[in-house]
Amino acid sequence: MNERALKVLEFYKIKEKLKGFVKTNAAKDIVDNLKPYTNLYEVEMHLEETMEALDLLQTKGEPPFEGVYDIRDILIRVEKAMVLLPGQLLKVASILKSSRRFKDYVGRKHEETPHKNIEDICEGIELLKGLEESIFNIVISDDEIADRASLKLYGIRRSLRDKNDSLRDRVNSLVRKYSPYLQESIYTIRGDRYVLPVRAEHKGSVPGLVHDQSSSGATLFIEPMSLVNLNNEIKELLLKEREEIERILEELSLKVYNNLDVVNVNAKVIWELDFIFAKAKFASHNNCTLPKVSEDGIVDIIEGKHPLIDTEKVVPTDIYLGKDFTSLIITGPNTGGKTVTLKTLGLIHIMGLSGLLIPAKENSTIAFFEEIFADIGDEQSIEQSLSTFSSHMVNIVDIISKADHKSLVLFDELGAGTDPTEGAALAISILENLRRRKCKIVATTHYSELKGYALKTEDVENASVEFDVETLRPTYRLLIGIPGKSNAFEISKRLGLGEDIIEEAKNNIESDSLKFEALIEKLQSKSIKASDDARRAEMYKLEADRLKDKYEDKLKIVEETREKLLKGAQEEAKKLIKEAKEEADEILKNIRELEKMGYSSTARQKLEEERKKLNSKIHKLEEKEENLNKEKGKKIKEINLGEEVYLPKLDQKVIILSKPDNRGEVQVQAGIMKINVKLDDLRLVDKPKEENKKGRKREAKLRMRTVESEIDLRGMDSMEAVYNTDKYLDEAYVAGLKEVTVIHGKGTGILRKSINDMLKRHPQVKNYRLGEYGEGGTGVTVVELK
């Protein structure tokens, strides 16, 4: 598709709107590269995938895109075997989690509507739950690793806690001892070492190492000698901790490297799905529908709207082309809205051919064009010193050299910018050249000569945009088959031009021209009514077809459900018979055992009675199973037209409308539908007896399950996190847990604030606090339950 048409028809503005619905920069790059596809198969496939995504949005809600990131830079680091940072690993895990959840989201039960294209895309997803869980279990936040990431790290941190506790006790003792010499009775930390704020004049009173001083020089930060060894031990442990963390990160990065191809494919699938669902959301937001795509150049756009015009102001218009004519000449005044019609037609086609649903009514048809050419607007080059006419002609020459039978050509004010007589003649010649090549052409003009050309030329049709002379505004409604009327006299009169001047002007025009204008006016009013009636009739027909299809689908579902129920009842009966026979065999076995053991004849008699009861039960069940295979009621022997009979297949009464044909079928009225059925399938209406329906009691079972002592919210948005936490706290309370941990990560703090706001109001929460060192710090909240 040539870039000039995409620019002139403002497809880039559509893409900017589409970007507003994507989640990742990777998907935005896909949007940037979006353009019409080069073959019909691709167009239809991408339209179908958009429609499938729209259906999933409507039936299953928002897809699981929480925590989807653009990790292309991270994957480049992995490809170079570089060690990833904790935050980068979390983004990789989030992509894996999203791809896994998306596979569940798209997965369907047998009776659900298939979404073939999206399901095929999701086939590319390979689950790496082990790697995903490894990362989430080890990495708590962008800058924190879990204590239990390894036994060694756990031991180091436990030693750190013990050393820090000892050091704090020791330093508190020193604070009390040296308090007369301190600026404040506190301790502080400088360079990971505990120090005391000693007044400068007493530095000799506190033996130790000076690490820093205040900006005024009045305070020295001294590490007492008695703390040096403990501080050194802590420093040593911190270095070991850092080394172990680096080892753990290297190990995780290696796992990502070993699965790089799978991670890469999963990420690309998620980004593609992000793009597809953005198309669906765009369609929903703009009331777009799925068009049919014609390979024969047939266009039938029903109530098409320009997608860039305000929805409250845009006027829908019908545009059709390619069946009865291949060229459409839209005439009328310059302010008549002709250019909007051109742009609407062109932009709707570019959208549809790019896999986007179109802003038009259902059952609209677009044509598959390999090229769309547009000469719209005044785009002359100042540098080239081109006039308006020359600028247009340069573009027209290019179009003529490239256009063929698979092209749509749009001309705005063809032949304008030069002498009217020469311009009109040139316009007709250009149109003829392209028409002979079987191009589909829509051209606007205000030259009257082109009206005559359209009237006398095969495959060319006149059209105009309706104009309201009362308001002096175009209605933007396209009237195909009616040439445009200038309305110059009516407009001038409305604006206050004298009646005498208007009459004199009319006298200067040939009477034939005036009659022609009057004829056009009459044709316009008749055409509008005929067009409205035809379109309304078409809509009624489509609605009737839709209802018919819907009824037939329901009929099919009823029949399938009935067969399933019948089969289920038969299976249940067989199962009961089998159980009863097994019970009888057990009784016989017991009888033989009793005989061997010398039991009394009374005991034997009782067992025989039980056996007879079971035999009776088996006989009844077998009869019931046999009856299930028979249709209800008696067969019909005589046919009486208009008689009400019973049709078991539909489980409803029907009326006989005809005698049996040579296939043994009769026509019956079932509700609003007339259908043919086998005479043998009908039963007398008085025979089917409705049994009293007994409600089944439902057994309520209390389901208890193990509740974890922590919940991981990373990768969720605030709303989802609050909902899941609220539900989790209720389950934890019922399970008897007294203390739980909510992992929200550090990040920007928005998620933590949302959780804290919810905890303040939760009825099961007694108290809560941020995690301490080793628990996860500010990346977790510890909750005490009532």
Swiss-Prot record:
The highest taxon in the source lineage is Bacteria
Tell me which residues make up the Smr domain. Answer: 711-786
Q: Which UniProt keywords apply?
A: ATP-binding, DNA-binding, Endonuclease, Hydrolase, Nuclease, Nucleotide-binding, RNA-binding, rRNA-binding
Q: Which Pfam families match?
A: MSSS, MutS_V, Smr
Q: Which SUPFAM superfamilies match?
A: DNA repair protein MutS, domain III, P-loop containing nucleoside triphosphate hydrolases, SMR domain-like
Q: Which GO terms describe its biological process?
A: mismatch repair; negative regulation of DNA recombination; rescue of stalled ribosome
- Provide the E.C. number(s) assigned to this enzyme: 3.1.-.-, 3.6.4.-
In terms of CDD domains, this protein maps to:
ABC_MutS2, ATP-synt_Fo_b
Which residues of this UniProt protein bind ATP? 332-339
Supply the InterPro entries for this chain: DNA_mismatch_repair_MutS_C (IPR000432), DNA_mismatch_repair_MutS_core (IPR007696), DNA_mismatch_repair_MutS_sf (IPR036187), MSSS (IPR046893), MutS (IPR045076), MutS2 (IPR005747), P-loop_NTPase (IPR027417), Smr_dom (IPR002625)
Q: How does it assemble?
A: Homodimer. Binds to stalled ribosomes, contacting rRNA.
Q: Which family does it belong to?
A: Belongs to the DNA mismatch repair MutS family. MutS2 subfamily.
Query: What is the name attached to this protein's record?
Result: Endonuclease MutS2
- The record lists the organism as Clostridium tetani (strain Massachusetts / E88)
| Gene that encodes it | mutS2
